[in-house]
């Protein structure tokens, strides 16, 4: 079995698909969008919808690249409830570059909830947090996410995390969104978060930043420009999330508000 978080590496529109799986690819400007829908259990990926967007290397993009941000925001918005508060969770270890995408993305989220911030008509309530790793907090990701959900009471949770690919040419060049929750491909991962555990829609968002080396199961491969992939990828994902949640604001306005 291929070790990958990317649904379209397992199920493509050009191959024979197992029963209960549909895949389709379309072009939107310079972005290739692939949608995979899994309608039954028992396959390599959980049942649900997956969307991947093939883009130029995110290391050369930023939060103002509308050609990528607009289609990404549209695809993400389609997976979310139409209204209500949203909590964005930055999963990962900010001290390990390949795993820092989630925490770095949270820094780019337009937060509209908080003490002293009255509701604004037309602006969706959004909170964002990077809970850290259990070795630092003493609490599991499931415990922290559960406590945050009970306190904030969002209508949906967006989990941002670094992803694993099985194809080196896709590292730093693909965005993926899914409504299946966070279900890492790596065996023994403690990052599983889904609707069954938390009682609300859980959307996963990420960019592949590593792959497992074939020569050894304990070795990983990362792109040469990893620092730029994380920095620019976090800005790009943050902009797409902001645009998906605040469609009344332009990309330029959101960039100015985030700073």
Predicted regions and their residues:
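A structural-propensity feature for long, helix-poor, extended segments
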Residues: 122-149, 153-157
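Short glycine-rich or small-residue beta-strand-to-loop segments that form or flank ligand, phosphate
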Residues: 54-56, 85-96, 128-132
């Amino acid at each position: 079995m291929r070790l990958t978080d990317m649904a379209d590496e397992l199920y493509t529109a050009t191959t024979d698909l197992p029963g209960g799986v549909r895949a389709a690819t379309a072009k939107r400007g310079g972005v290739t969008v692939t949608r995979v829908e899994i309608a039954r259990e028992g396959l390599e990926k959980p049942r649900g919808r997956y969307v991947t967007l093939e883009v130029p290397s995110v290391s050369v993009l930023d939060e103002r690249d509308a050609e990528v941000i607009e289609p990404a925001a549209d695809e993400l918005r389609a997976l979310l409830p139409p209204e209500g508060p949203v909590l964005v969770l930055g999963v990962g270890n900010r001290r390990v570059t390949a795993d820092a995408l989630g925490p770095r993305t949270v820094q780019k989220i337009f937060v509209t909830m908080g003490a002293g911030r009255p509701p604004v008509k037309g602006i969706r309530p959004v909170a964002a947090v990077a809970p850290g790793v259990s070795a630092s907090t003493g609490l599991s990701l499931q415990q922290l996410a559960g406590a945050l959900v009970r306190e904030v009471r969002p209508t949906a949770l967006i989990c941002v995390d670094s992803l694993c690919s099985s194809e080196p040419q896709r590292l730093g060049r693909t965005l993926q969104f899914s409504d299946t929750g966070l279900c890492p491909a790596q065996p023994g991962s403690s990052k599983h978060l889904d609707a069954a555990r938390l009682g609300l829609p859980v959307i996963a968002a990420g960019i592949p930043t590593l792959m497992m080396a074939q020569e050894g199961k304990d070795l990983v491969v990362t792109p040469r420009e990893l620092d730029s992939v994380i920095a620019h990828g976090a800005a790009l994902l943050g902009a797409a999330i902001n645009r998906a949640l605040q469609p009344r604001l332009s990309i330029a306005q959101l960039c100015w508000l985030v700073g």
